[in-house]
């Protein structure tokens, strides 16, 4: 599962599809609102289902952040939920000493579906990254900003899919963040 039309419906679920997510983002006018930080998108090649992520992909993500570190105020990594907590934890150790946010997010229900949690997760992650108040790897999901190396997947079906049972959330998104 993942965020957006980047996933094409297959008989047994969704599969990553290059280029589709950019088109899906263009259809969300709120991403271009005046209050939103300016953003850009870099796409991994090849796209993978998160259940197929390995240390190799963690290294690629960390290198992508390092290569573009000076050009951006923060980073949002869109990731499938199956291994998002593992990736967030690994990146938190690989990218120690950050002066900028690296926020991982995704969705339980892809944005290509009528009902999806992806839009809010994406928009709120961009707002948090753009604010620049967080200086570490975090996971944002279902209204909670969690420390990357303290997050764990709690539910495969619920929209509150991640928790940090032994450490408080860094922020809660309600009327304000």
Kindly label every feature range from the protein language model.
Residues 8-12, 88-89, 114-117, 147-154:
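Short acidic, glycine/serine/threonine-rich loops at helix termini
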Residues 111-151:
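Short, glycine-/small-residue-rich phosphate/pyrophosphate-handling segment
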Residues 38-68:
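Glycine-rich oxoanion-binding loops at beta->alpha junctions
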Residues 5, 79-85, 144-146:
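Gly/Ser/Thr-rich loops at beta-strand to alpha-helix junctions
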Residues 78-100:
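Short Gly/Thr/Asp-enriched flexible loops that form oxyanion-binding sites at enzyme active sites
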Residues 1-7:
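Short, small-residue-biased leader/transition segments that mark boundaries at the very start
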Residues 21-33, 147-177:
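Accessory alpha-helical/coil subdomains and C-terminal extensions
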Residues 77-79, 103-106, 138-143:
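Short beta-strand segments
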């Amino acid at each position: 599962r993942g965020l957006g039309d980047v996933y094409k419906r297959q008989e047994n679920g969704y599969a990553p599809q290059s280029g589709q997510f950019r088109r899906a983002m263009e259809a969300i006018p709120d991403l271009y609102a005046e209050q939103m930080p300016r953003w850009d998108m870099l796409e991994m090649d090849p796209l993978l289902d998160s259940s197929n992520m390995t240390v190799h992909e963690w290294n690629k993500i960390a290198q992508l952040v390092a290569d573009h570190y000076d050009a951006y105020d923060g980073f949002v990594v869109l990731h499938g939920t199956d291994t998002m907590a593992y990736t967030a934890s690994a990146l938190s150790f690989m990218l120690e000493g950050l002066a900028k946010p690296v926020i991982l997010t995704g969705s339980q229900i892809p944005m290509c579906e009528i009902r999806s949690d992806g839009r809010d997760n994406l928009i709120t992650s961009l707002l948090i990254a753009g604010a620049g108040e967080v200086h570490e790897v975090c996971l944002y999901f279902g209204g909670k900003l969690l420390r990357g190396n303290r997050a764990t997947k709690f539910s495969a079906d619920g929209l509150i899919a991640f928790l940090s049972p032994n450490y408080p959330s860094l922020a809660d998104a309600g009327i304000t963040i």
